[in-house]
Amino acid sequence: EAKIAEMILAMVDGADELDVVANITAIKNGDWMAIADEINHIMPIVRSKGKKIKVIIESGVLTNEEIIKCCDIYGIAGIDYLKTSTGYAEKGATIEAVQLFKKHLPSNVQIKASGGIRDYAFANALLAAGATRLGCSASVAIVTGAPATGNY
């Protein structure tokens, strides 16, 4: 309910795209009904306002099987983007996770790779693996070839 309240406030404030962090505890516990129930409550609200939704699953802490199950559930729910990471987990975007997303998501669901993207080569590899959008705090360094600073 807190997620829905925050989403409504964000839309009232003018947000066109919403980032929603998946319930990682439910995923790790295999409580797939809770995951499906949550997204199925969120989607009608988002769609009724014509907004886009990105679901973040922290792929760096999930098994391949958990990632695939998330792709199945969120893909069927009709999300716009599946996103690899918030940037707070120890492990961010990986080529392997993006490839799993690409293989198991419906073609209409886009992939946002985020977390730990520090240089052009890695950014390009993520795009080649199937990412359609990148979330990078080192964007200037990536496009200019300069060394990235900071840890995100």
Regions found by a protein language model. Name each.
Residues 1-9, 62-73, 100-103, 107, ...:
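Catalytic cores of alpha/beta
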Residues 1-9, 29-38:
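Glycine-rich anion/phosphate-binding loops
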Residues 12-27, 76-91, 115-122, 127-152:
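Glycine-rich phosphate-binding active-site loops on the catalytic face of alpha/beta enzymes
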Residues 22, 57-61:
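Generic secondary-structure microfeatures
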Residues 28-31, 60-64:
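Active-site glycine- and acidic-residue-rich loops that bind
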Residues 29, 57-58, 85, 108-110:
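Short, contiguous strand/loop micro-motifs
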Residues 32-54, 72, 76-77, 92-119:
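Alpha-helix-loop-beta-strand connector modules within alpha/beta enzyme cores
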Residues 52-58, 67, 81-83:
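A contiguous pocket-lining binding segment that forms or flanks enzyme active sites
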